[in-house]
Amino acid sequence: MDEQEPAPKRGRRFKEQTPVQRALGLLVRREHSRKELNRKLLARGIEPDAAQATVDRLTDEGWQDDTRFAAAVVRNRAGSGYGPLHIRAELGTHGLDSEAISAALATFEGDWTENARDLIRRRFGEQGPTDLPQRRKAADLLARRGFDGNSIRAATRFDLED
């Protein structure tokens, strides 16, 4: 019997991904800010110059857009029960300037007070907070979630006519 060489394994051959491929892999999952995308590329071993060039290229080609990212964050967080102060702070951590943040918050089509009331209804039931300790708890919850004072007062007042 002849000794035969083993057949080559049938498996995928993984080629090292280029910085652009890695960045696109991140962007197809969800939107990223320029700062966040650059940080993630650096964490994956991409050289700083190559990472910055990749982010610039993808921004120029429309794959990455801070305005689109900010609008998505506003939509997502507002739908999860967070207020404008929390969202503004979160967008600031992503390296967006105050003008971009203000523009993104302006795209929100809902009413912050109504969002606050919805959150209170989910936590305290349809009748809302009934006594002073519950109203304080509700106000504390809304403050932690980033709602402003006017929205907190309006949401914890809970007049049935509103």
UniProtKB/Swiss-Prot annotation:
Alphabetical list of InterPro entries matching this protein: RecX_HTH_1st (IPR053926), RecX_HTH_2nd (IPR053924), RecX_HTH_3rd (IPR053925), Regulatory_RecX (IPR003783), WH-like_DNA-bd_sf (IPR036388)
Keyword Cytoplasm among UniProt keywords: yes
UniProt superkingdom: Bacteria
TM helices/strands, residue ranges: none
Keyword Cytoplasm: yes
GO cellular component term, pick one: cytoplasm
Gene Ontology terms: biological process: regulation of DNA repair
Swiss-Prot/TrEMBL keywords: Cytoplasm
Pfam families reported in the protein's UniProt record: RecX_HTH1, RecX_HTH2, RecX_HTH3
Described function: Modulates RecA activity.
NCBIfam families: PRK00117.2-1
Entry protein name: Regulatory protein RecX
Organismal lineage: Bacteria, Pseudomonadati, Pseudomonadota, Gammaproteobacteria, Lysobacterales
